[in-house]
Amino acid sequence: MTEEVIVIAKWDYTAQQDQELDIKKNERLWLLDDSKTWWRVRNAANRTGYVPSNYVERKNSLKKGSLVKNLKDTLGLGKTRRKTSARDASPTPSTDAEYPANGSGADRIYDLNIPAFVKFAYVAEREDELSLVKGSRVTVMEKCSDGWWRGSYNGQIGWFPSNYVLEEVDEAAAESPSFLSLRKGASLSNGQGSRVLHVVQTLYPFSSVTEEELNFEKGETMEVIEKPENDPEWWKCKNARGQVGLVPKNYVVVLSDGPALHPAHAPQISYTGPSSSGRFAGREWYYGNVTRHQAECALNERGVEGDFLIRDSESSPSDFSVSLKASGKNKHFKVQLVDNVYCIGQRRFHTMDELVEHYKKAPIFTSEHGEKLYLVRALQ
């Protein structure tokens, strides 16, 4: 019989959507699914729902492990079935999701070109899936945090379960101790001699809750030395003082790959300003094709609370995102363009200007404590 996993709420959380669950600090909950960035839990009243995974911690022996992975290990090889395509709407929230979360709740990594070896045969069950032949090699083009990857084989492109393949690396890297330790999910206690994966800069201050986490202030530069396979939302980093610990990956921006550069040669973040091309070229709030990270940096460098910009969506070329400077953590809101109507949550607007003017007068976001956020002015 599989061990029942209990988690304890570290902070209060008030549900923002129907599929979420209210929790109170120190409340005892039963973990039902930890396969995504939000966990599904059950409370003492037998109510179930999703909560942010960093708001709870495991109480018993499966700490830092995956409930789904343990079930798979117990029952043998299994695959996570997608009830919808990774490109379709999903009811599962994500800690990295834009608000309101109308699109997929899964985080995705694009523009990859990684060879992978097929460990097990797989027969496609949907039109957008890819059949795999055991022993063959596929090219991974995209990764989705729901456990499915998109790749190509023999001219065909589609989705397949990621645990059916093994990424390939060059022979020298495969034999290195640092690579082997990362593959095994080994803990690097001091970072000495470990391979530096990225150099990152912190976007916000963070106070550790557990001994294995690392405190940091906004603007610090750190080295990423490990990406734990069983805890993908956290990276193990080493700061300038040599301290090592886990940090939430959505609190940092990648500056470069490899070891840190001398401060005199540190990469500089280029100026990001309004776009002279694109659908809303010339509008002071339209920044065009900039990334979420670029928007974050621009808002943090020269914005004040209420400053905003609108950019093209990274995941849906025809859609847009509103990035808003807020105290603590900036907010990002998905705007979908459907039949020439701009949709944000359940609201619809005929023009983007109409949307902007509406949220200058009505709150675009209300926190669990009743704090209201408005679009005040375009980022200067």
Swiss-Prot record:
- Residues annotated as carrying Phosphoserine in the record are S90, S94
Q: Give the source species.
A: Homo sapiens
Q: What does this chain do?
A: Adapter protein which associates with tyrosine-phosphorylated growth factor receptors or their cellular substrates. Maintains low levels of EIF2S1 phosphorylation by promoting its dephosphorylation by PP1. Plays a role in ELK1-dependent transcriptional activation in response to activated Ras signaling.
Where does it live in the cell? Cytoplasm; Endoplasmic reticulum
* Protein name (database record): Cytoplasmic protein NCK2
Q: Which residues carry this modification: N-acetylthreonine?
A: T2
GO annotation terms (biological process): actin filament organization; cell migration; dendritic spine development; ephrin receptor signaling pathway; epidermal growth factor receptor signaling pathway; immunological synapse formation; lamellipodium assembly; negative regulation of cell population proliferation
PANTHER family reported in the protein's UniProt record: CYTOPLASMIC PROTEIN NCK2 (PTHR19969:SF12), SH2-SH3 ADAPTOR PROTEIN-RELATED (PTHR19969)
Q: Describe its PTM?
A: Phosphorylated.
UniProt keyword annotation of Transport present: no
- Gene3D superfamilies, per database record: SH2 domain, SH3 Domains
Residues covered by the SH3 domain: 2-61, 111-170, 195-257
